[in-house]
């Protein structure tokens, strides 16, 4: 019986410049910030921006809403 998740070999690496070829952000270009080989996903600078609601902390007693990049599947990008 196998355990764990198999790593997928990806065609992009950190700091590669890529273009999104499908999805809502089609045509946008950016630099790869992080790669998740277990999930086959990458985070690209300035692409797939979503709002994240943060809990209140001592530094931000009201809580906050921040915008950050979320991962997209590596098959939706190509090197440029």
Swiss-Prot record:
Keywords: Ribonucleoprotein, Ribosomal protein, RNA-binding, rRNA-binding. SMART domains: KOW (SM00739). It holds the Pfam family KOW. The keyword Iron-sulfur does not apply. It comes from the Bacteria. GO terms for biological process: translation. The keyword Ribosomal protein applies. One of its GO terms (molecular function) is rRNA binding. InterPro entries: KOW (IPR005824), Rib_uL2_dom2 (IPR014722), Ribosomal_uL24 (IPR003256), Ribosomal_uL24_CS (IPR005825), Ribosomal_uL24_KOW (IPR041988), Translation_prot_SH3-like_sf (IPR008991). One of its GO terms (cellular component) is ribosome. Residues 53-80 are annotated as: Disordered. Part of the 50S ribosomal subunit. Belongs to the universal ribosomal protein uL24 family. One of two assembly initiator proteins, it binds directly to the 5'-end of the 23S rRNA, where it nucleates assembly of the 50S subunit. One of the proteins that surrounds the polypeptide exit tunnel on the outside of the subunit. This is Large ribosomal subunit protein uL24. It comes from Chlorobium limicola (strain DSM 245 / NBRC 103803 / 6330). The gene is rplX.
């Amino acid at each position: 019986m196998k355990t764990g998740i198999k790593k997928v070999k990806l065609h992009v690496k950190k700091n590669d410049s890529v273009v999104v070829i499908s999805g809502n952000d089609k045509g946008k270009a950016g630099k790869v910030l992080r790669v998740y080989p277990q999930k086959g996903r990458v985070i690209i600078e300035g692409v797939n921006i979503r709002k994240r609601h943060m809990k209140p902390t001592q530094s931000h007693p009201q809580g906050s809403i921040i915008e950050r990049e979320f991962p997209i599947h590596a098959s939706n990008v190509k090197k440029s």
